[in-house]
Amino acid sequence: MKYQHHSFNNKEVEVQIASFSNGNEVSEYHIILQGTQPTLTYKEQLNNLTDVYNSLLTGELKGASALFKRYFLSDAANQGEMLLAMATEYSDCALSIVEQPPLNGTKIALWVYLQTNVQSRVLPNGLFEAVHGNYRHFWGGSAFNRAANSEYQTRLLLNDYVMQLMEQGCTLADHCIRTWFFVQNVDVNYAGVVKARNEVFVTQNLTEHTHYI
């Protein structure tokens, strides 16, 4: 693993890059982009991060394709619409938005996972597919629903995901590597998430006698 740190002072942005290459045709990158000037407006910070990210794709990371992006916002309710408008225009991978303010007081940070020599596309069911050689990976992000409580929401989310996997000849037990759940007001809502998750897992042969995700 190789680690790099770059400062783009003209854009008030710092970038951390972790790269892995074992000499085969596919290299992997995790990059974190974060503003350094808290006094800039959210729009200015978003534009600066986008400009730096695009410059990386045409420079140091040329040939790499994004498979997953996660934005960390200080105020998702008021900032998400502008971000989604821009992200939809450049939609090239699974996208996740989380309200988790950067520690340095700025309003937005971005984590991106990229690979080289992959072909990616969005599937009709909403998953993103990345293919290299004989391998296929499926990514999803920003799934949510407005069911009455956290239990119902979790059950619907997982059942929808099970169906998405089935359409690709996959199962939750055999092919899902990792899930992320972001829960508002954990003290109140987490119990419902756990209840629904465990109940769905049983139907998918994910038990103490097999394995969990």
Task: Describe each region flagged by the PLM.
Residues M1-I213:
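Short, polar/acidic, helix-capping and beta-turn segments at strand->helix junctions
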